């Protein structure tokens, strides 16, 4: 089986079955090869990994020269369980030169902060980022992350970003609202949307 077929099949299977040691070894090999599309696929697949090795591969991919690979790795690191991952995501959410990477690093940082008992630190850090971050996609993810961490006052700012010109950003706002929508806030979200 060639690499492309292996990656596509594993991408479909990984949601339902655990990644085997043999498959993990092959993913590690591909993560070190030249094809950036394949490296990005490795990162996408590893969101389904529950192993330290999967997290280590993703951490390595956050250093990739290709920003799409870094973005996919950051997105998949929502599974992270270590302070090393927390610190790497924190750094990327602030310092990566590409907004897409900063945005995905922000959401994954939020996702792993609870398991590491770092919510208070994360909230302070993310709120400080609001003062300097200009990229709309990153701001969407900052508002979403802060809302998910209990800072409900950021919902209105998130909804206001539905007015931005780029449809990709409006789609990201809609996705974020769908992600945070539940029985406890659906009335409030619908009210804000109707007022908006």
Predicted region positions:
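Structural detector for internal amphipathic alpha-helices that build alpha-solenoid repeat scaffolds
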Residues: 2-19, 29, 37-51, 60, ...
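Residue-level recognition of hydrophobic positions within alpha-helical transmembrane segments
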Residues: 68-71, 92
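Short inter-helical turns and helix N-cap capping residues of alpha-solenoid HEAT/ARM repeat scaffolds
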Residues: 34-35, 65-66, 97-98, 134-135, ...
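Amphipathic alpha-helical scaffolding segments comprising HEAT/armadillo-like alpha-solenoid repeats
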Residues: 17-32, 51-63, 82-95, 115-131, ...
